[in-house]
Every structure is written in C-alpha cells, then in structure tokens.
C-alpha cells in the first residue's frame, strides 16, 4: 500500500472528514455599458458600501465588482450564494452588463479606469491610495484582469484522522506544514488547472497596445490569439511583477515564509522610489518598498488565516498558523453566468485533497524554476498534442496527457471515497467529464472558447454575446439561498457601518499612514 493510499484510507474512515470541508468563492467582473465601453459610473448605490458590504465589493477599479461568498460546507450552497448576489447586483445596475471574460476588452488607456473609491475614512483612503500605487507601478490595464479565487480548508475531522492526537501547538504546526506541502505540490502539478479551465486563449488587440511581446500571435480582426494557449491571463502578458522575481519567498515552512514576506515589505525599491510618495498633498503610493503591503505579493496560491482587526496577514499566520488556502489560478469561466461551475469546484476538492495526501518534499529555487517552466508551457501551448513537460529538473520528460492520466488515477480513488460519503456519484461524474478533456483538449474551456471566438469573428463579439445572455440569466434567477430582504438589510448595514467608521476617525490621513506603517520603522 502506498503512503497516499494509506493516508486516504485514514481520513475516509470518518465521513465528516470530507463532509465538513470549507469552501468560499470570490469572483471579479467588470461592469460595462451597452456600447461595450467600460462603465464610468460609480459603484451602484443600491448594493451598499463597497468598504463594508460582506458579499459585494470592488477590487482595483470602481467598475471592477467582486462578489464574495461566506464559508460553506456544501458545493451547491456556495454556488447558490454566488448566483443570488449576482442577481441582486445586476438588478441594481440598470442596463449595464458584467464582462464574462478574464481579459478586459475595449480598454487601452490607464485614464479609462477610475480607481475604486471607499469614502473619506482613513481606511477607505488607504485602500484607494494602495490602488493608486499599483497604477503607478504596473499600470491600470493590468489591474483590471479578472479572476476567480477559491478559498479552501480541510475539516477538523480530516486533520484528526490524518494527524492523530496532538497538543494544540503541535496540531497548529502540523496543519501549517501539511498546507505548505499542498502548496508545493500545487506548484508542481497545478498546471492542470489552466489546462482544464484556462479561459483566455485570445484577447483584444487593444490590451497590448504599446507593449512589447515576444509571443507569436495570430490575428482575427482585432483579436490576437495563440492556437494552443489556455490562459494568457497567467502568462507574462497577465499580471506579473518583475520587481518580485528576486524575492524568493520560501514555501518550506511557515517561519521561512513569514520571514520572506516581512523582508519583502521592508525592502526599498529604487524603481518605485522614483515615483515619489506624494504629488502636492495627494498620496500616490503607500511607500516605496518592493511591496506596499503584503497583498501586493503575486502568487497563484496563498496560505491564509482570517485576521483580527488591525492585524496584518503575516501576523495572523504567525499567531495561529494556516487556516485555509486561497487558489488564485482560475480564469473567469465565460460559459457560466457566475464565472465558475460545479465541475471546477469538485475538481479543486479532489486535486487539493490529493495534493495534501501525496508526498511533498521541500523545494529549492531551482526546482521551483523548473515547475514554473511547466506552467508557462501550459498557459501558452497547453492544448498542443504531445506537449512535453519536465519532471523536476533531472531532464526526465512526460507529455501533459500522460502526466494528467497518472494524477487522474489517484483522483478517481478520492472521487469514489467522497461519493461514498455523500451517497451519489457527483465527483466521479466530474472526473469522467474532465478525463474526456485529457483525451480531447478541444473540450477544455480554452478550446471551446477559441472555437466560438473564430466562429463569431472576434473575442470582443463573443464577450458581448455571452454578457447579454448572462445578464438575462441573472435577471431571471430566483433567490435560492438568501432572500431579497436579507440582502436589502446587508445594504443598509453596510452603509451605516461606513458612516460609523468615518465618524470615528480622529487623525489626519498622513498621521494615520505613519501610524499604520510604524512596524516598518
């Protein structure tokens, strides 16, 4: 019996180990107008305060909505929650629509994009100033690329069965170690996510206007595409940060990770210092370090813990270890009105469970570089027949198809165990549908989207068509988890909460900033 099989049998012995898995979804999407332009209107007043609303907020731009679900222990529930908040929001947006693709279209200039506004409180100004810094550092167009983030945690029962009886401190350390093992395996094998679910094989030519690229694009009118690409969002064209490439933050232990993160937020950047901190009285970045704050760290997966008020993410991790992980490699699924579907959630359940139960040796920088090379191949060439990937750095190679099949043998074993607990075959059905995509890459989301794009005559055309369909689906939707009254009450609560925060501020913003970054001194 392999170690993987042994560990799987342990956790599967307790039905609650899988039943109580925690999941949450964050979905980003741009508001745009009837004539296919980015919305210049403020955040819809009818959905409350973007600063304090639990489920409906904004990301980088005022027009970049973000929908957030609470933690749920049921796959269908988390999707129902997302459907309900989409319905509520679209009902308050007039004729505007939600852009159904990760890559923005019809946006070519930073000036087209208004930064997200959060009111006059110090914390609201801090959030907008942080975004001003991102704009000055990387440009606004990069920042309005949309994605879906999947938050995931194993149950206490899962850890009880896997780790046995332990003191509270030992359990905290063991759980953090196990999550870092998962994260390292995610870097090794997570290219499966863009292979199946990458949804940006093409983009509007306006997106790369004035930018240099070595990619050998083919064109279709104003659309640029790579014939075998899966996720240009995850490529060098997407949101990347050259200044971060030298950070080398270790994923081998929580202490090393926190140490690396602390170093990054304290390391001055010559390049960013040239931007300056203020223009007149206006703050234009929070500081001139490599990272203004920890959230600026670009990563396809992050270890997380819910922070207490005033606590930095790394301080929360240091206090009590890893609570959950945030998967950040999902493109928006253009074929789903909510940007993600049930098969994607179930695959991530299977894959993340496999990643934590499979051996995961420590990883050095050179090994990480080899795995990143595989990701780059998949995002640019993922559907190419016979594409070979590296197995580590020893020169051994395997086709993406053969490698995916190896992993899928193990995933099927997990699917059967999960289905046995739930009394259905939902995970095996997902496994079967994705197995067909291994055999035929054109069944993947990127394969289907590129075919539709060619048929329609351009990515902008297909984006507008899907947006109209999805808007109607949202308007036709009937509440299935929340009620309208509950969401109305959350709007009122959020507006009141913002007013209370603004009324309680006592110090000028410059003083507040000095105090906030006192830990850097």
From Swiss-Prot:
Annotated metabolic or biological route of this protein: Sulfur metabolism; glutathione biosynthesis; glutathione from L-cysteine and L-glutamate: step 1/2
Sorted UniProt keywords: ATP-binding, Glutathione biosynthesis, Ligase, Nucleotide-binding
Ranges in a coiled coil: none
GO cellular component annotations of the record: cytosol
Catalytic activity: L-cysteine + L-glutamate + ATP = gamma-L-glutamyl-L-cysteine + ADP + phosphate + H(+)
Domain of life, source organism: Bacteria
Single GO MF annotation: glutamate-cysteine ligase activity
Top enzyme class: ligase
Protein's UniProt keywords contain DNA damage: no
The keyword Oxidoreductase appears for this protein: no
Example GO biological process: glutathione biosynthetic process
Protein family according to the UniProt entry: Belongs to the glutamate--cysteine ligase type 1 family. Type 1 subfamily.
Name of the molecule in the record: Glutamate--cysteine ligase
Organism listed in the record: Aliivibrio salmonicida (strain LFI1238)
Annotated gene: gshA
């Amino acid at each position: 019996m392999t170690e993987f099989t042994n560990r799987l049998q342990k956790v599967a012995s307790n039905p609650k180990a899988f039943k109580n898995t925690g999941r949450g979804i964050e979905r980003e999407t741009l508001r745009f107008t009837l004539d296919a332009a980015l919305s210049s209107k403020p955040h819809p007043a009818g959905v409350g305060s973007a600063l304090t609303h639990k489920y409906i907020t904004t990301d980088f731009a005022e027009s970049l909505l973000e929908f957030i679900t609470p933690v749920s222990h049921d796959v269908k529930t988390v999707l129902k929650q997302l459907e309900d908040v989409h319905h509520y929001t679209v009902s308050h947006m007039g004729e505007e629509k939600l852009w159904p693709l990760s890559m923005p279209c019809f946006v070519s200039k930073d000036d087209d994009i208004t930064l997200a506004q959060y009111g006059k409180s110090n914390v609201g100004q801090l959030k907008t100033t942080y975004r001003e810094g991102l704009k000055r550092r990387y440009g606004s167009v990069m920042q309005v690329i949309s994605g879906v983030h999947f938050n995931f945690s194993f149950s206490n029962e899962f850890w009880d069965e896997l780790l046995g009886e332990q003191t509270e401190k030992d359990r905290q350390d063991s759980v953090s170690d196990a999550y870092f093992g998962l994260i390292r395996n995610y870097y090794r094998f997570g290219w499966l996510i863009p292979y199946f679910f990458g949804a940006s094989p093409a983009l509007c030519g306006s997106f790369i206007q004035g930018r240099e690229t070595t990619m050998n694009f083919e064109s279709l009118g104003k659309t640029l595409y790579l014939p075998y690409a899966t996720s240009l969002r995850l490529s060098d064209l997407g949101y990347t940060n050259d200044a971060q490439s030298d950070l080398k933050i270790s994923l081998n232990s929580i202490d090393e990770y926190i140490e690396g993160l602390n170093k990054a937020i304290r390391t001055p950047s010559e390049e960013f210092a040239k931007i300056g901190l203020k223009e007149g009285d206006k703050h234009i970045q929070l500081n001139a370090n490599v990272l203004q704050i920890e959230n600026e760290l670009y990563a396809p997966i992050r270890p997380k813990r819910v922070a207490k008020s005033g606590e930095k993410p790394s301080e929360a991790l240091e206090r009590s270890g890893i609570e959950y992980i945030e998967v950040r490699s999902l493109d928006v699924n253009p074929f789903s009105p909510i940007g993600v579907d049930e098969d994607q959630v179930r695959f991530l359940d299977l894959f993340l469970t496999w990643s934590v139960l499979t051996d995961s040796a420590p990883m050095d920088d050179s090994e990480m570089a080899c795995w990143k090379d595989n990701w780059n191949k998949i995002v640019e060439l993922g559907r190419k027949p016979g594409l070979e990937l590296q197995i580590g750095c020893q020169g051994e190679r395997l086709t993406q198809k053969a490698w995916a099949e190896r992993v899928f043998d193990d995933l099927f074993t997990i699917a059967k165990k999960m289905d046995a607990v739930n009394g259905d075959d939902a995970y095996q059905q997902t496994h079967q549908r994705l197995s067909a995509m291994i055999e035929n890459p054109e069944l993947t989301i990127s394969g289907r989207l590129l075919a539709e794009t060619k048929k329609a005559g351009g990515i902008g055309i297909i984006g507008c068509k899907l947006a109209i369909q999805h808007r109607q689906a949202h308007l036709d939707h009937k509440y299935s988890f929340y009620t309208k009254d509950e969401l109305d009450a959350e709007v009122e609560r959020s507006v009141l909460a913002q007013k209370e925060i603004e009324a309680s501020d006592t110090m000028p913003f410059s003083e507040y900033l000095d105090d906030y970054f006192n830990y850097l001194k």
